[in-house]
Design a protein with these regions (language model features):
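P-loop NTP-binding core
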Residues: 2-220
Length: 220
């Protein structure tokens, strides 16, 4: 969890206030990745949690040599231990997100079906290009994921149309729709699959997982 808000941590049922070590210690290299891993109640899902100290990590890393590569170095030993390693990033383009992009094999870009999301998309894609050029030439864009879609809203439909018009080959076929059960699940510390596997939100994310796995299978 590379987001100081720690939503991925709490959403997996972990008490953020009780976290003693996590991504902060990992990036400071005071703990190894294996020392910071927590096993969650979701089958086959572990997490390196975030906690409040992560807010300060960008200031503390700024003067360090090769500061953009701290995460890549820290998680390198885990790559053969897991099928997938997901890095949840904050909705900002600071040093923490730069570390995640430098460490990643590919990036999935969520786009809320709202007006300002389109402005942020251009900035993010430019950042990704810079990372590819300077820090991580092997970084691929896995795809653009449209989220919080409501078919009843004109704006939602306009955003989908604009994104597909300009980035058609990059957009996932799966669209994550607005769903009450999706909003409720994190407050119970459960994934949407565990909370309500029959919900529209669960179906959307299962479709995304299948699409992602199929795409990777085709490119291997």
């Amino acid at each position: 969890d590379a987001d100081p808000q720690a939503n991925a941590t709490s959403g997996l049922g972990i008490d953020v206030e009780g976290v003693e070590m996590g991504t902060y210690e990992l990036l400071e290299h005071t703990k190894t990745a294996k020392e910071t891993i927590i096993t969650t109640t979701s089958p086959n899902v572990d997490v390196i949690p975030a906690h409040i100290d992560l807010v300060a990590i960008e200031i503390e890393l700024v003067d360090k040599d090769k500061r953009e590569y701290m995460m890549r170095q820290a998680i390198s030993d885990l790559k053969n231990e897991y099928d997938y390693i997901l890095i949840d990033c904050a909705p900002s383009l600071g040093l923490l997100t730069l570390n995640a992009l430098t460490a990643a094999d590919s990036v999935m870009v969520p786009i809320q079906c709202e007006y300002f999301a389109l402005e942020g998309l251009g900035k993010l894609l430019n950042t990704i290009k810079s990372v590819q050029k300077i820090h991580n030439p092997d970084l691929d864009i896995e795809g653009l994921l449209l989220t919080m879609y409501d078919s009843r809203l004109r704006l939602s439909n306009q955003v989908v149309e604009e994104v597909k018009k300009h980035f058609s080959e990059m957009v996932f076929e799966t669209i994550i729709q607005r769903n009450v059960r999706l909003s409720e699940a994190p407050s119970y510390g459960e994934s949407i699959i565990k909370y309500d596997a029959s919900s529209k939100g669960a179906t959307n994310y299962l479709n995304l997982a299948n699409e992602l796995m199929q795409k990777n299978k085709e490119t291997v």
